[in-house]
Amino acid sequence: MPTSTETLTTVETAKQLGLLPEEFEKIKEVLGRTPNFTELSIYSVMWSEHCSYKNSIAWLKTLPKEGPHMLAKAGEENAGLVAIGEGLACAFKIESHNHPSALEPYQGAATGVGGINRDIFTMGARPIAQLNSLRFGDPKLEKTKWLVRGVVKGIGDYGNAFGIPTVGGEVFFDECYNINPLVNAMSAGIVKVGETVSAISYGKGNPVFIVGSSTGKDGIHGAAFASKDLTEDSAKDLPAVQVGDPFQEKLLLEATLEVIKTGAVIGMQDMGAAGITCSTSEMSAKGKSGMNIWLDKVPTRQENMKDWEILLSESQERMLVVVKKGHEAEVQAVFDKWDLNCVQIGEVTEGERLKYYMHGELVADVPAESLVLGGGAPVYKREFKEPAYFSESKKFRIED
């Protein structure tokens, strides 16, 4: 891998990162130049199917987004939010963790549970219940037995250690899931109406903090990996699977809910797919602002991590927090109390440029809007046709 930001990329580099040739050309058009490796890596994860929904967003937009009890439009926040009466709201989310679970079922399933819980409490809601919906292949296969044991244990262990009960679930077996299982985890939480926090960034000069666990090399390019087809050779992608720590997440939950009550938080987002890259770009695009981010300030678990590794890491139990200027010490005190990292790694800027620095060197300069779903990310309308079995199924009559 290139180590210098001066190394310009080619269409071959783009293809290796999962981008199409035409997408590489679009990136050059957006930037007005050829991207360096760090910038291309940023686009590769943000324009992956996992982050951008580029092959499905056209259809998803046709679904209803609002209703009389909805407090956030569908897709507007990191979790749904519905008024349930008496001044309370239910925050909920369901998310798949299929690819990671297919390779490393225990950690894949466990980190799926951790991720959805962070999306819930990052909004200010306290998680109260978890559910799951699972699909596996032929139960006679040894691989299926291995997957079932790992996934069920991963879901149970993370939920138990985190302290949130799994109140229900379902499981089905079919040969079509022999290679790629479906592992869907759901979490629901309760929050008072009007006390939620949005995943947004604004206010020139407001400090940007990373809180929670330290950053390692686990999960790098995880979003791009989750967008690929699984094959028998996918085991080499094991480093793209994240590693979770439910005890750390429990501390992060309590610290997050406490810091929200201080009134010092402008916006907050979990670092899930694409890590720092996704959080900084989505929060900035939503607030129509920019950020200067100092990557060498990020607490790391391993020495000599490269700038693009820090940007793309999907290490778990981390969040990005934008704080009201002048309230830094107040926020720091809360996370110190819970023995968690709380380090200022940047500041909000005017305009919509994301500028990432490493030891004073500008390593990437990209417009936030160009990266995100609903903004500059590609949208495709693929050809489709009705599967043959569907016409046969329609012939079924229950009275027959």
Spell out what each predicted region is.
Residues 1-400:
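Glycine/proline-enriched, intrinsically flexible loops and inter-domain linkers
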